[in-house]
């Protein structure tokens, strides 16, 4: 059996298959029917400094080859997480990483500072796709200056592994990736959801209460692959690839394009055990082609 171990900075993962934020709860919800120790890591649902109610319903819609969501980062805040969720997840036998976001840089910094104190949380994933309320609602991750500013601020207070989740809703994602690398990111994860919408033709109204939402699922995979491939040529830090992954072949494509690890997102709603199946599939692929380590595949597109 091949070696599936990978490293993001100084953090070691038993394999490159990770559960994406917002699709796997805090992990503990699935412990009765998924062997969490077989997954390389779990990114928690998004956590903010304060309690958030999220958006009005309806806030999810199925599409022909994916789904739209506009949940709006509903969560009970970082203090609730620390007091009530952390004690339940800290002993799960895999890397539990917290996805954080905020409406201001100050909120993100405060949230990161609190998570930094948790011994059993080795990394955070900073979501920079959220609107910056001090800049007219423009998302932090849509220009290099804002992206660099927020990553630099979080880096000053967060002393473990800092992963930055990039938005695909930009002209050139490689410029943003390079900016956050320079600002201190240990890795980048890409891509987050694309902006889309759906319409109910019977009532002539948008299906989502917010009109638009984040598009995910198989339909975005070719775009995600292209962006991972382009980014791999530009940055030196590890890339975590995500977007439409539903089987081990998809995962291997991302790794060949340059991803050191992958995240499974939307498909968790269809099959919560998919991550363990992908691990088995990657193992089988490496054995079939007589490869000794997953590292031999990263960026090896001919």
UniProtKB/Swiss-Prot annotation:
Metabolic or biological pathway, per its Swiss-Prot or TrEMBL entry: Pyrimidine metabolism; UMP biosynthesis via de novo pathway; orotate from (S)-dihydroorotate (NAD(+) route): step 1/1
SUPFAM superfamilies on file: FMN-linked oxidoreductases (SSF51395)
Keywords: Cytoplasm, Flavoprotein, FMN, NAD, Oxidoreductase, Pyrimidine biosynthesis
InterPro entries per UniProt: Aldolase_TIM, DHO_dehydrogenase, DHOD_1B, Dihydroorotate_DH_1, Dihydroorotate_DH_1_2, Dihydroorotate_DH_cat, Dihydroorotate_DH_CS, Dihydroorotate_DH_I
Cofactor: FMN
Name of one Pfam family that matches: DHO_dh
Residues noted as binding substrate in the record, renumbered to the chain: 45, 69-73, 127, 192-193
The UniProt record lists the keyword Oxidoreductase: yes
Binding residues for FMN: 21, 45-46, 99, 127, 165, 191, 217, 243-244, 265-266
A GO CC annotation given for this chain: cytoplasm
Catalytic activity: (S)-dihydroorotate + NAD(+) = orotate + NADH + H(+)
Enzyme class name: oxidoreductase
Localization of this protein: Cytoplasm
Cofactor note: Binds 1 FMN per subunit.
PROSITE patterns: DHODEHASE_1 (PS00911), DHODEHASE_2 (PS00912)
One MF term in the entry's GO annotations: dihydroorotate dehydrogenase (NAD+) activity
Record-listed E.C. numbers: 1.3.1.14
One of the GO BP terms on file: 'de novo' UMP biosynthetic process
Primary role: Catalyzes the conversion of dihydroorotate to orotate with NAD(+) as electron acceptor.
Oligomeric form and interacting partners: Heterotetramer of 2 PyrK and 2 PyrD type B subunits.
Name of the molecule in the record: Dihydroorotate dehydrogenase B (NAD(+)), catalytic subunit
Species per Swiss-Prot/TrEMBL record: Azobacteroides pseudotrichonymphae genomovar. CFP2
Lineage of producing organism: Bacteria, Pseudomonadati, Bacteroidota, Bacteroidia, Bacteroidales
């Amino acid at each position: 059996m091949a070696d599936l171990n990978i490293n993001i900075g100084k953090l070691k993962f038993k394999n490159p298959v990770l559960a994406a934020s917002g699709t796997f709860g805090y992990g503990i919800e699935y412990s009765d029917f998924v062997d969490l120790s077989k997954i390389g890591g779990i990114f928690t649902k998004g956590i903010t400094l304060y309690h958030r109610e999220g958006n009005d319903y309806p806030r999810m819609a199925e599409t022909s080859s994916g789904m739209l969501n506009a949940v709006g980062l509903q969560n009970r805040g970082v203090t609730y997480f620390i007091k009530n969720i952390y004690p339940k997840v800290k002993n799960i036998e895999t890397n539990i990483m917290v996805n954080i976001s905020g409406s201001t840089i100050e909120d993100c910094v405060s949230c990161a500072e609190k998570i930094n104190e948790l011994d059993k949380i080795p990394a955070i994933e900073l979501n920079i796709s959220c609107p910056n309320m001090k800049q007219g609602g423009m998302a932090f991750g849509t220009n290099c200056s804002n992206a660099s500013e927020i990553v630099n601020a979080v880096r000053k207070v967060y002393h473990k592994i800092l992963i930055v989740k990039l938005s695909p809703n930009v002209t050139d994602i490689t410029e943003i990736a390079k900016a956050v690398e320079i600002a201190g990111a240990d890795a980048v994860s890409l891509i987050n959801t694309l902006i889309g919408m759906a319409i109910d033709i019977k009532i002539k109204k948008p299906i989502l209460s917010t009109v638009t939402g984040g598009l995910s699922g198989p339909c975005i995979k070719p775009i995600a692959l292209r962006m991972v491939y382009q980014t791999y040529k530009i940055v030196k830090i590890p890339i975590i690839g995500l977007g439409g992954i539903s089987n081990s072949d998809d995962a291997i494509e991302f790794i060949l394009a340059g991803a050191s690890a992958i995240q499974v997102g939307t498909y968790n709603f269809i099959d919560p055990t998919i991550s363990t199946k992908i691990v088995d599939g990657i193992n089988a692929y490496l054995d079939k082609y007589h490869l000794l380590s997953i590292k031999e595949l990263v960026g090896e597109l001919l």
